[in-house]
Amino acid sequence: MTDDTLIGRGEKRARELESFFLDPEMGHIFDISGGDLANTVLGHLDLEQIKDSQAVFYGYSDLTTILTALAKNGNQAVNFQLRNCLVNKDLLKSGYFDRLLAGKEKNKELDELEVTFVRGSKMAGPVYGATSAAC
């Protein structure tokens, strides 16, 4: 894409995303487009306007810039790629994913996850992410 084709796209996408958050019927927002242009959206997103939305935003990879901003804003943001449901058909067949979206399945906190340590028995230290400086 040339710079000419990108002009205004971030603002347009930000307005569209805001409209999803402002729709009281919207429960879940899945971005399946990828996040190549996520940084162009971030500067135009009116976080104050959408802060009270109950909609949950799901994204992955480059979209972590938006996930981080939404989470810091008090919105629900999940680092998840919908394509995982195509790869792991058990998520759909078991009904787990449907129950989770319907609010009938409890989300597990990080300290509730079942993990096996390959080396040692605990983790300690700061957590760093690729987008920690984005917001």
Language-model segments: residues:
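Short beta-strand elements in bilobed, periplasmic/extracellular small-molecule ligand-binding domains
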Residues: M1-D4
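Active-site histidine-anchored catalytic micro-motif
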Residues: L6-P126, A130-T131
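Short acidic-hydrophobic catalytic motif
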Residues: A134
